[in-house]
Amino acid sequence: MKPFIKWAGGKNSLLDEIQKRLPDFVHSQDFCLVEPFVGGGAVSLWALSDLPHLKQLVINDCNADLINVYQVIKNNPDDLIGYIENLQSHYDKLTDLESKKPYFYHKRDVFNQRTSNDIEQAGLFIFLNKSAFNGLYRVNKNNQFNVPIGNYKKPTFVDKENILNISKKLQNTKILSGDFELVLAHLPNNFPCLFYLDPPYRPISDTASFTSYSDNGFDDNEQKRLANFCKKIDKLGHYFLLSNSDPKNTNSSDEFFDELYQDFKIERIQANRTISANSNGRKKVNEIIVSNGV
């Protein structure tokens, strides 16, 4: 299985590093995985495929439109596939970008009205994700998706087999939409829990925060609240892994995360990405992985 959408900050490239740091119990006893910031779901979908002892999954995101897609994939995969295939058929008949533009912007307007049923809203979400510029999901302050059309000749909107496989695997999943702390009310009593936390990254430059994934900002105060949440997880006896940007990439004296997570293990790993829009100035960057090692 693979993520059904493109997602900025997706964790496919970090999966190897995450796997290396998983606690031993995930390979030997039944457990629950909790993702309070599920996003594109790369970690959860990998775990559902590759960790047979995963017995329950709890996923959450503050982006209600995204969570609706997960709910529809879980409950109505065939209807969703049919709706997207219909969008695909109409889009493919439009032979060039200029002819595709009116269709794209009409569907974007329909999505932003949010008056369609859940299946259609989910289908439009995936359509826009696959046809908009660079797979970005960005909304303005009024929660209006505002990414322009991308220059794709023949994008594929839906992988039927992948959606059906994900749907089967999501049947024992609790799907939530709201604040990240919401997940604590939905933990099982009979399994140990592993939390993977992938919050909106703290910007490492003034231009790095170009993307808004929801209409809720995630500033330094939110990062501090998340650190307190991690302390709460630790006191409850659960294991957590958290990923974030490393401020030291651009300011070697920035101790923000080192101070925030001083009670836990902080590791710096090389990310599979670069910073600077100038190709001559691109350089590899580090990310941090924080864990508690319960």
From Swiss-Prot:
Catalytic reactions on record: a 2'-deoxyadenosine in DNA + S-adenosyl-L-methionine = an N(6)-methyl-2'-deoxyadenosine in DNA + S-adenosyl-L-homocysteine + H(+)
The keyword Manganese is assigned to this record: no
UniProt GO BP: DNA restriction-modification system; methylation; mismatch repair
EC nos: 2.1.1.72
One matching Pfam family: MethyltransfD12
Top-level lineage group: Bacteria
GO-annotated molecular function: S-adenosyl-L-methionine binding; sequence-specific DNA binding; site-specific DNA-methyltransferase (adenine-specific) activity
UniProt KW keywords: DNA-binding, Methyltransferase, Restriction system, S-adenosyl-L-methionine, Transferase
Binding-site residues for S-adenosyl-L-methionine, renumbered to this chain: W7, K11, D61, D198
Transmembrane spans: none
Catalytic EC class: transferase
Function: This seems to be a stronger methylase than M2.MboI.
Family: Belongs to the N(4)/N(6)-methyltransferase family.
Something else known: The MboI restriction system has two different methylases.
Full protein name: Type II methyltransferase M1.MboI
Organism: Moraxella bovis
High-level lineage: Bacteria, Pseudomonadati, Pseudomonadota, Gammaproteobacteria, Moraxellales
Gene: mboIAM
